[in-house]
Amino acid sequence: MEKLTEQQKLEQRRLGPVNKAAFRFMVGLATVLFKKKYGVSFTYADDIRPYRGKPYIVVSNHASRVDYVFTAPAFWPDTFNFVVGYNEFFRSHLAGVLRAMQTVPKKNFVQQPYAIRQMIRIIRGGG
C-alpha cells in the first residue's frame, strides 16, 4: 500500500468540535505564557454575554501565528475550532497541537471545499 502524503492525511481527517477540557487548558497555558508578554487586554464593543454557550462564528483579523492568544481568551469560557493556514501543519512544533485541537486546515488564497465541509461538520456537531 502506498504511503499517504501529509496533504492526503489532512484531507482524510473528519473533524468535530474541539475537546472543551483540552481547549481550556491550552487557552489557560497560552494566557499564562503570553498575555503579559504581549500586553493582551480586551475591550468589548458589544456585550457578548447573551451569546455565551450558544453557537456563533467568530471572524477575526489575522494578527500573527499567535492569533489564539488574542482571540480565545476574549471568548472564555466558550470554546471553538480555529481555521489555520495549511502550511502551519508542516511546522513540527505546531502540527501535533493543531491536530489535537481539531483545527481546520485551509490553503491560502484558494477555494477549498474540504475546509468548508469540515466547518459545516463541526457546526452540525455542536461546535
Segments (PLM) and residue ranges:
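A transmembrane-helix-recognition feature enriched in membrane-embedded lipid enzymes
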Residues: 2-46, 92-101
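Soluble catalytic domains of membrane acyltransferases
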Residues: 37-127
